[in-house]
Amino acid sequence: MKLKWTLFILLTLIFTGCKQEEWKDWKIHNEAWLVQNATKEGIIKTHTGLQYKVIRPGIGNQRPDDLKQVLINYRGTLITGIDANGDLIAGREFEVGKQTVMGVNTVIAGFAEGLKKMHKSGKYILYIPYQLGYLGLGQGTKGTMGYIPPYSTLIYEVELIDVF
């Protein structure tokens, strides 16, 4: 238990002591951010490391599974696109989807896991560690819109409109 608290304090100091332009190790910074985020009110953490917050629980008993398709609204950002209240900052998204249809089994592991927890008309914020995202590979081309650096925590605001 002491080790966990020591690690938490150390990571918190690293996180709060750095400015964005001073980040030397993006992986460590993202891991520290997730440790701090997990302590916030309303954050639920799964055994895989996915964290999520229920904004609106949704209705009914039907949840998506790997064989389903979903109709969703979503926005995605990195930890640099979140304000102090945990809200996504407009204009800092790497991805903004309108009403989009996608297969649950066609997305990254953390996004699929989050979708499977939702009910129709529900709205969640998913905090996806790099292990459930793009790993150490990243996504896209550096310097272009939509680029996701390696080891990035991905944050998605997702509204589940329909399941079919």
Predicted regions and their residues:
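Cross-family detector of peptidyl-prolyl cis-trans isomerase
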Residues: 2-6, 18-164
